[in-house]
């Protein structure tokens, strides 16, 4: 079933495979995604007036804020960009201005749409690539005009086609004409002059277009290059750009991380270099404006913005009132417990345990984690979080890496062995480090 047609229940169930707990946040993003589908069912002109309800996630680091947004975008197959709010400065200061968010999102959508189109025409491109390679191996007869005549394959050509498909001539060298790749030209222009930059790029690209070079390469490499070339010929660039821009405008998701860092705190004195300025620059983007990109104008009216922050030193009310109003849905995420850590390690798809088991399995080392080993690992990670900085589930990465450090280093020497990770093994490897506050702070 397409993600666009999934009900909120189904979306939450899909997110549950990767993220433990945080049901309120999952429900909020599931409804936001479902509302996009609902909006598409509404007739114009009312459809245009329905705007997405942006979400503000509040919670400490490592509890799943970013992962929820990333998994949602993957589920919806939507253009998605994660950016740090602290990377941007007010227009007029040295640094990136907020319009680059939409430009980067559009670049991502172009890439995503191009990959989709290339897959769609790939079978035709492969047929054309086969013919071009066979032309180099068994040239077809030429007509009176000197052009190759296409007809039924002769027996030699049929034999080579069969061997090509079976991979029996992959290492054979052939001489073939390959299109020269266009030089990567990046024209630097001031904000607002992207159209001029695009014209310059087009001019330089036009100089290099249709240039071919004869190369002597193996059939395997030639096939890949020609398939790419033939697929690119079959993709209409104008249609691709139009589809990509529509995809950004209707389905784009922007994840604004660390938004609490640009909130001006009451007790802070000094110039506050452009904190409020960045917030004011974000306002039109979130509210709905038109941004000029190298591919055309992009409207942001229906792009979904998800902001997140720990809000340890600032409060959501420290954001300027206008920006607060642009994020009507607020969700607080809970800190993770030791029980949550157990679930993260054992229940999620692509859990850390599955990842490390697969990695060491490539060297024929079999890892077996017992229930008490997993629980002890979770308890130690939770304990270190309690006594030092609480970095949430990210602590599991450092603890797991330390646990398997020696085993990973000596994996080739342990080939064919079965290693059982139980509570005793975890204590042997980690108890001393986790027990000492100083060591835990700097090692874990």
From Swiss-Prot:
Region feature (Disordered): 130-158
GO annotation (BP), single: protein unfolding
Superkingdom of origin: Bacteria
Pfam families given in the database record: AAA, AAA_2
Subcellular localization, as worded in the UniProt entry: Cytoplasm
UniProt xrefs under InterPro entries: AAA+_ATPase (IPR003593), ATP-dep_Clp_protease_ClpX (IPR050052), ATPase_AAA_core (IPR003959), Clp_ATPase_C (IPR019489), HslU (IPR004491), P-loop_NTPase (IPR027417)
Residues involved in ATP binding: 20, 62-67, 257, 322, 394
Main location: cytoplasm
Keyword vocabulary terms for this entry: ATP-binding, Chaperone, Cytoplasm, Nucleotide-binding
GO MF terms held by the record: ATP binding; ATP hydrolysis activity; peptidase activity; proteasome-activating activity
GO cellular component: HslUV protease complex
Oxidoreductase keyword on record: no
Family the entry assigns: Belongs to the ClpX chaperone family. HslU subfamily.
Known partners and oligomeric status: A double ring-shaped homohexamer of HslV is capped on each side by a ring-shaped HslU homohexamer. The assembly of the HslU/HslV complex is dependent on binding of ATP.
Entry function: ATPase subunit of a proteasome-like degradation complex; this subunit has chaperone activity. The binding of ATP and its subsequent hydrolysis by HslU are essential for unfolding of protein substrates subsequently hydrolyzed by HslV. HslU recognizes the N-terminal part of its protein substrates and unfolds these before they are guided to HslV for hydrolysis.
Identification of the protein by name: ATP-dependent protease ATPase subunit HslU
């Amino acid at each position: 079933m397409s993600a666009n047609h999934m009900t909120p229940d189904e979306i939450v169930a899909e997110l549950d495979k990767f993220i433990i707990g945080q049901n309120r946040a999952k429900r909020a993003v599931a409804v936001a995604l479902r509302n996009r589908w609902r909006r598409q069912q509404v007739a114009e002109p009312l459809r245009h007036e329905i705007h997405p309800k942006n979400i503000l996630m509040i919670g400490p680091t490592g509890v799943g804020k970013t992962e929820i947004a990333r998994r949602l975008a993957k589920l919806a197959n939507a253009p998605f960009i994660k950016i740090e709010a602290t990377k941007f400065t007010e227009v007029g200061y040295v640094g990136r201005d907020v319009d680059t968010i939409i430009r980067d999102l559009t670049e991502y959508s172009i890439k995503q749409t191009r990959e989709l189109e290339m897959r769609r025409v790939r079978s035709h491109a492969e047929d054309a690539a086969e013919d071009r390679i066979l032309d180099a191996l068994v040239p077809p007869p030429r007509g009176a005009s000197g052009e190759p005549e296409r007809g039924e394959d002769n027996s030699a050509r049929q034999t080579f086609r069969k061997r090509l498909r079976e991979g029996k001539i992959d290492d054979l060298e052939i001489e073939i004409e390959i299109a020269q790749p266009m030089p990567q030209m990046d024209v630097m222009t001031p904000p607002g002059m992207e159209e001029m930059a695009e014209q310059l790029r087009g001019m330089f690209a036009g100089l290099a277009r249709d240039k071919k070079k004869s190369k002597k390469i193996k059939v395997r490499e030639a096939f890949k290059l020609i398939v790419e070339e033939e697929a690119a010929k079959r993709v209409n660039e104008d249609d691709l750009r139009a589809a990509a821009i529509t995809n950004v405008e209707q389905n784009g998701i922007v994840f604004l991380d660390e938004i609490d860092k640009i909130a001006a705190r009451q007790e802070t004195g000094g110039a506050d270099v452009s904190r409020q300025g960045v917030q004011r620059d974000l306002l039109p983007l979130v509210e709905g404006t038109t941004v000029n990109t190298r591919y055309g104008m992009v409207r942001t009216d229906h792009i979904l913005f998800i902001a997140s922050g720990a809000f340890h030193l600032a409060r959501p009310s420290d954001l300027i009132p206008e920006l607060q109003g642009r994020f009507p849905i607020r969700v607080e995420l809970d800190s993770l417990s030791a029980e949550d850590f157990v679930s993260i390690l054992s229940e999620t798809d692509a859990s850390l345990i599955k990842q490390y088991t697969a990695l060491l399995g490539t060297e024929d080392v079999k890892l077996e984690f017992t229930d008490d080993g997993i629980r002890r690992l979770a308890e130690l990670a939770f304990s270190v979080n309690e006594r030092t900085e609480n970095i949430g589930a990210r602590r599991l990465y450092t603890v797991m890496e330390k646990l398997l450090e020696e085993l990973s280093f000596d994996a080739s020497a342990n080939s064919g062995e079965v290693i059982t990770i139980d509570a005793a093994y975890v204590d042997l490897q980690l108890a001393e480090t986790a027990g000492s506050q100083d060591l835990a702070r700097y090692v874990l």
